[in-house]
Regions:
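Extended, histidine- and acidic-residue-enriched regions that form the cofactor-binding/catalytic faces
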Residues: 1-107, 113-254
Length: 254
C-alpha cells in the first residue's frame, strides 16, 4: 500500500497500481451545473474532488478520477448545466463497480458531492444486496454540515455554505457578486424542485444567501467535515469488517 503522504491516483502508472494492489478505492461523484453568477459550474466537482483526495490519503486508498457529471435535472434551463439521466448514472456506477471488483478491490467508497444524485441510493443498495466480493460505502461529504445545522433549510444551493467552502478552496474562482434567494412564490419547498425546477423558484439560480459567506466560515466548515467524515467512514469500515453479508448482523446465527 502507498504511504499516507502519497496518493495512488490517475497520475500513477499501471505497474504502480499493480504493485500497490490496494483493496480500497474512493470514487468521488460530483455534478456539472449552474451555481448562480458567482460560483463556477464545476463547484460540486471541485469540492468533492478535494474531499476525495483527503479521504484517499487518510486511508491509503486508491483514488479514482472524479465523475464530473451527475443528475442535475432540476437545473434544466440554465446554460452550461450538463446532466445525466438517473438511469445513466446508475449504469455508470454499475460498470465502474464491476471493473474495480474484477481488479481485486473489495471496498469502494462512493463519495457524493451533489444533493441531487438520488439515484446513487438504489444502485448501491442493489449491488450490496447481491453479496458480491465488492462492497460499496455511500457517503456524502456535506452530511455533517446538514446534521450540525450549519446549513439552514433556506440554504440549499449556491448560498452561504457552498460559497464559503469555495472561498476557502478556490477563492480565485468566486466572483464578487453575492446573490441571495428572491423567491418567485411563497411556500415553496425543496421537494417542489422535482415538479417546477430551480429556475421557477429561483431565476437567479441561488437558493440561499451567499452574502453571508466568508473564507473563515469555509475553513471552519472544512475542518469539521474532515473530522466527521473520517469518523463516519472508519466506523462503517469496521462494520464491514465484522460482517459483509447484506442484511445480517455481525453475530453468528445459531
Amino acid at each position: 500500500m502507498p504511504k499516507r503522504n502519497s496518493l495512488l491516483d490517475g497520475t500513477r502508472t499501471s505497474p504502480q497500481w499493480r504493485k500497490a494492489r490496494p483493496k480500497l478505492c474512493v470514487l468521488p461523484v460530483g455534478a456539472f451545473e449552474q451555481h448562480s453568477s458567482h460560483l463556477p459550474l464545476a463547484t460540486d466537482d471541485i469540492q468533492v474532488d478535494y474531499f476525495g483526495q483527503f479521504v484517499a490519503r487518510e486511508l491509503g486508498a486508491a483514488l479514482l478520477p472524479t465523475l464530473n457529471y451527475g443528475t442535475s435535472l432540476e437545473h434544466t434551463g440554465f446554460r452550461g448545466t450538463i446532466s445525466l439521466r438517473p438511469e445513466t448514472l446508475m449504469q455508470v456506477i454499475r460498470d465502474i463497480a464491476g471493473e474495480v471488483e474484477r481488479q481485486g478491490f473489495r471496498t469502494m467508497i462512493l463519495l457524493n458531492g451533489h444533493g441531487g444524485n438520488f439515484s446513487l441510493l438504489p444502485v448501491v443498495r442493489d449491488i450490496n444486496r447481491q453479496d458480491r466480493r465488492l462492497k460499496i460505502l455511500l457517503v456524502s461529504w456535506y452530511t455533517s454540515v446538514l446534521e450540525s445545522g450549519a446549513q439552514g433549510k433556506s440554504d440549499i444551493h449556491a448560498g452561504e455554505v457552498e460559497t464559503s467552502v469555495m472561498l476557502a478552496l478556490r477563492p480565485d474562482l468566486v466572483r464578487p457578486e453575492r446573490p441571495r434567494l428572491k423567491p418567485s412564490v411563497k411556500g415553496f419547498q425543496q421537494p417542489d424542485l422535482t415538479t417546477f425546477g430551480m429556475g421557477f423558484i429561483a431565476p437567479d439560480g441561488v437558493y440561499g444567501d451567499s452574502s453571508l459567506a466568508s473564507r473563515e466560515k469555509g475553513e471552519k466548515l472544512i475542518r469539521r467535515v474532515k473530522q466527521d467524515l473520517m469518523k463516519h467512514i472508519r466506523e462503517r469500515l469496521e462494520w464491514l469488517r465484522r460482517s459483509r453479508i447484506y442484511g445480517r448482523s455481525g453475530r453468528a446465527e445459531k
